[in-house]
């Protein structure tokens, strides 16, 4: 039951966020020019690709959540389920990821306002905070293993590592894109090229959407872990 609710929550949040971003996306109000049909197609293709990707990965996390709840209920395993004491550092990690998502949003707002220098600083801050979050997650694995109430081979510990690792891998992939976008920002600020800056805005928008989505997924995963 909780697994189905988790799937429904992720789907609803994803759809809501995408609709909000779609309504807020008014490229004709930027720079005082109307977009051409080619510009619209060029900017829409990456957004559609990201939305499809988010929907697919949301389903993946939903399946993991369903498997988790089935295993908690005693299905499909010989080893009895023993709850894991969640490491306290997860609360700090959650706050760090919230700050990273907030920094990413500020970076987008600054860059949309043509403040590329200020936006660049917040964009880099978001990346650094994300690295801190990943380091904190690795430390959480060590804390969970040394907790004493479950062994490293227990189902609870295995699911804990699985859920946090899959989420972390998606963040690492996002950091790769963030690095490329940061390089574009530096080049765009120096070149002062209209086309380059337009592409930077699109890249930052996609990164911001992705970071917000990963924050929402982590909140769902964390709530799932705490509930059991």
Predicted ranges, named:
Residues 1-228:
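...captures the hydrophobic TM-helix bundle architecture rather than a specific catalytic motif
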């Amino acid at each position: 039951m909780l697994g189905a609710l988790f799937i429904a929550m992720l789907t609803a949040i994803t759809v809501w966020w995408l609709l909000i971003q779609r309504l807020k996306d008014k490229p004709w109000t930027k720079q005082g020019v109307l977009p051409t049909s080619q510009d619209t197609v060029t900017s829409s293709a990456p957004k559609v690709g990201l939305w499809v990707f988010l929907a697919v990965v949301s389903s993946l996390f939903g399946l993991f959540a369903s498997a988790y709840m089935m295993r908690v209920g005693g299905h499909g395993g010989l080893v009895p389920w023993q709850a894991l004491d969640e490491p306290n550092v997860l609360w700090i990690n959650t706050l760090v990821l919230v700050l990273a998502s907030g920094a990413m949003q500020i970076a987008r707002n600054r860059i949309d306002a043509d403040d590329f220098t200020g936006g660049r600083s917040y964009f880099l801050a978001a990346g650094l905070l994300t690295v801190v979050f990943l380091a904190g997650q690795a430390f959480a694995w060590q804390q969970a293993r040394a907790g004493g109430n479950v062994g490293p081979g227990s189902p609870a510990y295995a699911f804990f590592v699985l859920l946090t690792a899959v989420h972390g891998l998606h963040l690492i992939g996002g950091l790769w894109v963030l690095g490329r976008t940061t390089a574009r920002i530096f080049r765009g600020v120096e070149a002062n090229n209209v086309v380059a800056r337009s592409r930077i805005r699109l890249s930052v928008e996609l990164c911001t959407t992705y970071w917000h989505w990963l924050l929402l997924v982590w909140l769902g995963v964390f709530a799932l872990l705490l509930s059991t």
